[in-house]
């Protein structure tokens, strides 16, 4: 089933990656962020080719988060892409994936 979640963007990502923006044709991997000191159940979003730091995370109250954590805990892998959607005339970064 296709899922869309808002992306909590990692403000440190541009400096670490050297990218000034997210490539249009991107691929991301969803995985537990075991190095997140603030959230033991953080779901990180890693941009393909940049494994050192996550591009961002799913929000704690995201409606897809529990299902994503279950899938990851069962040994599943989740991939998708990031896109910008316009909502109420605001550009919002979202991660689109299949669950």
Segment roles from a protein language model:
Residues 1-99:
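Conserved active-site motif detector
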């Amino acid at each position: 089933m296709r899922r869309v979640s808002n992306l909590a963007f990692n403000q440190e990502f541009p400096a670490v990656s050297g990218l000034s923006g997210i490539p249009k044709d991107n691929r991301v991997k969803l995985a537990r962020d075991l190095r997140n000191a603030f959230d033991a159940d953080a779901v990180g979003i890693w941009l393909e080719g940049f494994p050192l730091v996550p591009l961002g995370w799913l929000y704690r109250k995201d409606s897809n988060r529990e299902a994503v954590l279950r899938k990851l805990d069962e040994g599943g892998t989740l991939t998708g892409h990031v896109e910008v959607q316009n909502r109420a005339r605001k550009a919002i970064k979202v991660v689109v994936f299949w669950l």
